[in-house]
């Protein structure tokens, strides 16, 4: 498959993640998780990663058009004609038996077919850029992906890449991020002062591009499929960057959808509602619980204030690693209830420790 081409890029290995809040630290090691599976992934600069994939696919004979915009789609049953606009404004058309929308934040079909609907995740926005990480420490400290929580709903990500650059960005309530004055660069420079731990490391470094702001990052849709099309990855649902759930849904939805499309084009009957939509919603609902409970503070309580129970930590680690369909995991099967319950126990233990102290 594509794995060998990606291995040649020597991306930074992500074997876990670190969460910080003040002087408290919670480390997750993907090799110590409840569900069997991969113990690592990569920390990748997305542009390079995507280009590595498209370059490899072109060697397989896949036609990929760059610098084109989809401006219209007309369906006749499951057949469709897609209108494409070139950089010079000229139009062309593509006929297809089936469309897979993997356009991410571009959300092509949701926009054209009026499929967008409000997400029930809170209104958060992100602001981010890349820097040449010239003050990067040696060893694990310099390479570990870290989430620095500066307040209940606002946190900084630090994602080091193997090419010497690092992605830095904040997520927080939309109105809070909008409250910072000036250009996008000035906004992010001011926000970096919120991180006592990382401020010195990134102070004075030039941003590789004007920081990008994505407003109200959580997205949802009225339906995940229709006659002749399917939505995959972020073009369907996007919750929040905090647990890399977008990567999980992108890979899983694309894999499931591709198998179902192959069946359908071979003349077999496919139950898109149960085999795709309901299946994907199961995973979305699990991750949505963890995102919501992150911002209520319950999950943060488990991370930073609970007695370190290795069984519970392994079960939560499996969720963070993307294994959100494993019903053997109590933190998947009982996700609605269990996070609240364990957080409450942690708070009681904390109060008990205070009274003893």
Each predicted region: which residue ranges?
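N-terminal FAD cofactor-binding segment of flavoenzymes
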Residues: 1-22
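Hydrophobic "anchor" residues on beta-strands that sit immediately upstream
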Residues: 4, 93, 97, 230, ...
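FAD/FMN-dependent oxidoreductases across multiple families
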Residues: 9, 176-260, 264-277
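A short, glycine/Asx- and small/polar-enriched loop/turn
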Residues: 13-15, 22-23, 74-81, 225-227
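Helix-loop-beta segment of a Rossmann-like dinucleotide-binding subdomain
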Residues: 25-44, 81, 171-175
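Short beta-strand to alpha-helix junction loop
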Residues: 34-56, 177-183
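Predominantly flavin-linked oxidoreductase catalytic cores and closely associated redox partners
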Residues: 56-199
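C-terminal helical "tail/cap" subdomain of flavin- and related membrane-associated enzymes
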Residues: 259-357
């Amino acid at each position: 498959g594509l794995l060998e081409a990606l291995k040649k890029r020597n991306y930074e290995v992500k074997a876990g993640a670190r969460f910080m809040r003040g002087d408290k630290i919670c480390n997750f090691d993907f090799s110590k998780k409840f569900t069997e599976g991969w113990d690592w992934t990569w920390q990748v600069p997305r542009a390079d990663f995507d280009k590595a994939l498209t370059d490899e696919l072109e060697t397989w004979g896949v036609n990929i058009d760059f610098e084109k915009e989809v401006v219209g789609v007309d369906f006749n049953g499951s057949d469709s004609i897609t209108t494409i606009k070139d950089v010079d404004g000229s139009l062309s058309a593509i006929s297809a038996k089936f469309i897979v929308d993997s356009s991410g934040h571009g959300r092509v079909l949701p926009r054209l077919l009026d499929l967008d609907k409000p997400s029930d995740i809170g209104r958060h926005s992100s602001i981010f850029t890349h820097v040449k990480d010239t003050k990067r420490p040696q060893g694990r400290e310099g390479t570990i992906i870290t989430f620095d929580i500066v307040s209940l709903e606002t946190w900084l990500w630090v994602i080091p890449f193997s090419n010497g650059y690092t992605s830095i960005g904040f997520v927080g309530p939309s109105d809070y991020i909008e409250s910072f004055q000036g250009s996008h660069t000035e906004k992010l420079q001011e926000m970096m002062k919120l991180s006592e731990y990382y401020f010195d490391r990134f102070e004075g470094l030039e941003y590789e591009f004007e920081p990008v702001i994505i407003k109200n990052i959580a997205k949802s849709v009225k339906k995940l499929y229709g006659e002749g099309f399917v939505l995959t990855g972020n073009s369907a649902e996007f919750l929040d960057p905090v647990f890399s759930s977008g990567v999980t849904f992108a890979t899983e939805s694309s894999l499931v959808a591709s198998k179902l499309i192959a069946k359908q084009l071979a003349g077999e009957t496919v139950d898109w509602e149960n085999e795709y939509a309901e299946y994907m919603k199961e995973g979305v609902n699990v991750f949505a619980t963890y995102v919501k409970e992150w911002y209520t503070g319950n999950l943060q309580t488990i991370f930073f204030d609970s007695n370190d129970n290795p069984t519970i930590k392994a079960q939560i680690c499996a969720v963070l690693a993307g294994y959100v369909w494993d019903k053997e995991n109590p933190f998947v099967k009982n996700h609605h209830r269990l996070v609240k319950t364990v957080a409450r126990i942690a708070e009681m233990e904390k109060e008990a420790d205070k009274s003893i102290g």
